[in-house]
């Protein structure tokens, strides 16, 4: 979910409590709030880049397009190596977009902070990946 501007952890937690939800805060630091509610992990993150979010879901939720999400994940690989990002990128690159298309969009959003050469290298380098969130893919052979 995307919101323009800074996140406000107290307001977020108040909204959960108003809805009588039990919440476990796992991280609360400048620009980021991680919590667990109903066994679902949420990350609220102050993302300093202006990303379009034109896809509307249920008249009140707006998210980026799949290509924009792929560009964000490509950029994120340079800062963190999360298994879930590799999995998401696997399916996006396999079924929807090329590395060049993702890179073009990432360069549009992140400019010289993004490197297609680095991204291609990261797709082939698995040392240091965080497997904290393992996906159970029973539909894969």
Model feature map: region roles:
Residues 1-141:
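Compositionally biased terminal segments of proteins
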């Amino acid at each position: 979910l995307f919101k323009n501007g800074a996140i406000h952890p107290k307001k977020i937690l108040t909204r959960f409590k108003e809805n009588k939800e039990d919440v476990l805060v796992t991280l609360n630091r400048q620009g980021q709030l991680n919590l667990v509610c109903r066994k679902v992990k949420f990350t609220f993150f102050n993302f300093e880049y202006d990303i379009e979010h034109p896809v509307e879901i249920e008249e009140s939720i707006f998210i980026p397009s799949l290509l924009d999400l792929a560009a964000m994940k490509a950029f994120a690989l340079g800062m963190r190596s999360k298994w879930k990002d590799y999995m998401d990128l696997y399916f996006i690159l396999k079924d929807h977009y090329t590395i060049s298309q993702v890179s073009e969009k990432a360069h549009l959003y992140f400019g010289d902070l993004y490197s297609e050469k680095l991204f291609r290298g990261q797709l082939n380098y698995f040392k240091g990946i965080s497997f904290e969130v393992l996906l159970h893919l029973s539909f894969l052979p």
